[in-house]
Every structure is written in structure tokens, then in C-alpha cells.
Amino acid sequence: MPSPNNPTRRLTVLAMLAAVAFVLSWLDSLIPLSGALPGAKLGLANRAVLAGLYRLGPGPGALLCLLKILLATFLFGNAYSFFYSLGGGLLSFVAMALTYRRCSPLFVSLLGGMLHNVGQVLVAMAVLETPGLVAYLPVLLLCGMGAGCAVGLAGGILVARCRRALHGTPDSQEK
């Protein structure tokens, strides 16, 4: 069995997570929440980013986050969505990378979901020069909490699958 630190194995897991993030971004784009709650998304692809952070570490996790943003923007978005996604993604990933060793995946995901919305509102306030957008933040924070919880709970399954791919352990032996 190859070592979990084997560069080829780690690159393979990173590529698989990037593919998962791409498919989940596509599914996320098919779920129309923006009519009811502008700016709200389920953030399904963040499951893959969370798994990458926990299984591969902050460096590969950051690369995965950037790949997810670039792929989703080029295929499903526009120039504006790139900046909103980048602002939210970077802020949330930095917070998740600073807390993932000390906190549960559920908390880390919850924090990431909320800070993603904070980052997007900050970008919107700068781009639109409208400080009043901060009034929409409580609604987006509630959405971020819900999405973060869902991603954190479901992300645990993906983390376990990545552990299995990296270490070759069956799910029943995981703790």
C-alpha cells in the first residue's frame, strides 16, 4: 500500500476533489435560490474544499478553493461573480484554515459559510459603493449558517472517503 504522503496519491486525491467540486458547482448552479434570496447559494462544492483542507492540508485546500472558484466562474458565472466568489472564498478559507485543527468540521464549515457571505457583502459594498448593503448581511448570515451546517454534516462523508483513498482504511475502521 503506498504511503498517504505519496505525491502521486495526494495529487490524485486533489484531482478527484476538484472534479467533485466541479460537479457540485454545476448542481449548485441548477438550484435557483437567487430569485428568493439574492446572493444565497447552497455552496455544495464547499464539501470538496472542506475535505481537501482536512485530508490534504491548507496548501492543497487553498488550491482546491481557487480551482473551484475559477471553474465555476468560467463555466457558470461572469466577471462580477468571480470577484464576489473570490472575496467570499478567500475570507472563508483563511478562517477555516486557521481553525480546522482545533475545531470540528461542522464548526469549521459553519464559520466558512458565514464568512463567505461576509466577504461577498464586503466586495459588493466596494464594487457598488453602497454601504447600506450591510443591512442584508443578517439574512445572508442565516443562509450561510444553514448552508455551512449542511456542508459540514455531508462533508464528513467525503472526508471519510478521502481518508480511505489516502490511507486505504475501510470506513468501518475510521475513528
Residues covered by each model-derived region:
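Alpha-helical transmembrane segments and their lipid-water interface positions
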Residues: 32, 49-50, 64, 120-124, ...
